[in-house]
Design a protein with these regions (language model features):
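A short SAM/SAH-binding and catalytic strip from SAM-dependent methyltransferases
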Residues: 26-39
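Conserved Rossmann-like nucleotide-binding pocket used by diverse enzymes
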Residues: 11, 29, 58
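Short conserved AdoMet
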Residues: 3, 38, 52
């Protein structure tokens, strides 16, 4: 389909210092980025900052877990997050209509030593007020 051709722009950058002006994005979508951010709360606040009024933020990431090997082998900084903490961060970023729900799938990986992990995933959604 070409109906929306030219209306989507992809940007690569630091989630904690997005090089865009405030209120420019209709939507921000992030997949498995928070657990790699030194300050995930700041990343959420920054993503909310660039949203237009009624713009939507949708993130998926790992639920809290104990697979320490992911820090060394996958450059994870955080071992997932609790839904309550993510909801709190969305609220502090002045988002409304917040939902943090479990996804119907797992993030699976195998360590260099053969350890297997199947970690729950959440999907968090919010709307800029």
């Amino acid at each position: 389909r070409t109906a929306g051709k030219g209306r989507v722009e992809f940007k690569i950058g630091d989630a904690e210092k997005i090089p865009l002006e405030e209120g420019i994005a209709d939507a921000v979508i992030g997949n498995m980025i928070l657990h790699h951010c030194p300050q995930p709360k700041s990343a959420i606040r920054e993503m909310a900052r660039i949203l237009k009024r009624n713009g939507r933020l949708v993130l998926s990431d790992l639920e809290k877990h104990r697979e320490e090997w992911l820090k060394n082998e996958m450059a994870d900084i955080w071992l997932g997050f609790s839904p309550l903490k993510v909801k709190e961060w969305f609220r502090e970023a002045h988002l409304k209509a917040i939902e943090v729900l479990p996804a119907r799938s797992k993030c699976c990986g195998v360590s260099l030593a053969g350890r297997k992990a199947a970690i729950g995933i959440f999907i968090a959604k919010g709307v800029k007020g």
